[in-house]
Amino acid sequence: GHMRNLCLEDSLIRLMRRAYGQEKIISTTFPGDVGTHVAKCLWYIKNHISEYEFKQRSEAEDRGEWLGQMYSAGNLKLEDEASIPEQFEQNKKELTAILKQLEMQSGEFFDLWKETRQWSVDLMNKVYQWADVSFDRWYWESEVDAASVETVKKYYVEGKLQKSEGAIGLDFSESNLGFCLLLKSDGTGLYATKDLELARRKFEEFQIQKSIYVVDQRQALHFKQVFKTLEHLGFEQAKDC
């Protein structure tokens, strides 16, 4: 799926640059370098991989691929232990603590994240070089993570968003799009929160007139909600996303 989207977006960029000019088309990417999937990988490495093995892996050429294996192993381990109430709660607390460290940018898991994140970046660059694909701007999920929550709070204070059962978002039931949840009742954000902030940055940083998202069809409802929210917040460009 990732390779299909990569080929599709690169083809679109090349075609549009031939039609409209190199300088009028801006290519961007949005790698997910934080989130539960990252926390699971870090959790498994810290709890189930020896320092010796980690050091050996850190010097190996396939260390990027190894991280993918660690995520899969961590996911399976957590699923196996989910049936044990005490262990489930303990693991849940540890994952929450990991995500908190990444958000605060401090702690042993943040240090581990910085090192292993670079492995992933190196692998991505290697793949992109092989595929002859490049981007004008890399937006990182970690770059918009905390800022996205503050942006939603700001719009809520301005009266542009609404609260429902402690959560913040917008109700688009009349458009058959349901409720676009932007902040959960515990104050944490979601993918829509980050996509809202990402779009805001692209609109304001590049003053773009049209934004094309190359994503899976299964994300159609999600992005319809995000674009509708952006329109509501005054971003007219969202009508042409």
Map each language-model feature to its residues:
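NTP-dependent nucleotidyl-transfer catalytic core
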Residues: 1-241
